């Protein structure tokens, strides 16, 4: 049984703003690469208890896709502790997707949060 949550605009905001790692796959039923990538995403969701996996159907949620600047599908977004760490378009091969998941988990979030705070302070 897959551990993937379907998100809409309201649930997206709460899902990505909390603690922990959330990987979001923006997809569409008519998208060939999305269908190719789906088993890779599902396998990762079943094997990685340290990460929350979610999907957004862009046809059911066009406003969310627009707000998230999704211009092609599939688009992957990786959030950790409420901060967007990665966004890319295109289906990833299994090994590359696993590398992305490991890299997101290995990020020093104290350093990232310090950089975000410094940037916000400099912008007034």
Predicted regions mapped to residue ranges:
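Conserved Rossmann-like nucleotide-binding pocket used by diverse enzymes
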Residues: 3, 27, 52-54
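A short beta-strand-turn-helix
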Residues: 4-22, 62
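Short pre-active-site segment immediately N-terminal to redox-active cysteine/selenocysteine motifs
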Residues: 19-20, 27-30, 72
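Conserved helix-turn-beta segment immediately C-terminal to the redox Cys motif
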Residues: 19-21, 36-56, 62
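Conserved redox-active cysteine motifs that mediate thiol-disulfide chemistry
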Residues: 26-40
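Non-catalytic, surface beta->alpha helical segment in thiol-disulfide oxidoreductase systems
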Residues: 72, 78-111
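CheY-like receiver
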Residues: 109-124
């Amino acid at each position: 049984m897959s551990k993937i949550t379907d998100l809409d605009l309201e649930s997206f905001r709460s899902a990505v703003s909390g603690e922990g790692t959330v990987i979001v796959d923006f997809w569409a039923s008519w998208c060939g690469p999305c269908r190719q990538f789906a088993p890779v995403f599902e396998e990762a969701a079943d094997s990685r208890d340290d990460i929350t996996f979610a999907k957004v159907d862009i046809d059911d949620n066009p406003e969310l896709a627009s707000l998230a600047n999704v211009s092609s599908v599939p688009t992957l977004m990786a959030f950790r502790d409420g901060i967007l760490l990665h966004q890319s378009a295109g289906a990833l091969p299994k090994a590359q997707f696993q590398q992305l998941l490991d890299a997101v988990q290995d990020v020093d979030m104290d350093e990232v949060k310090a950089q975000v705070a410094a940037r916000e302070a400099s912008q007034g």
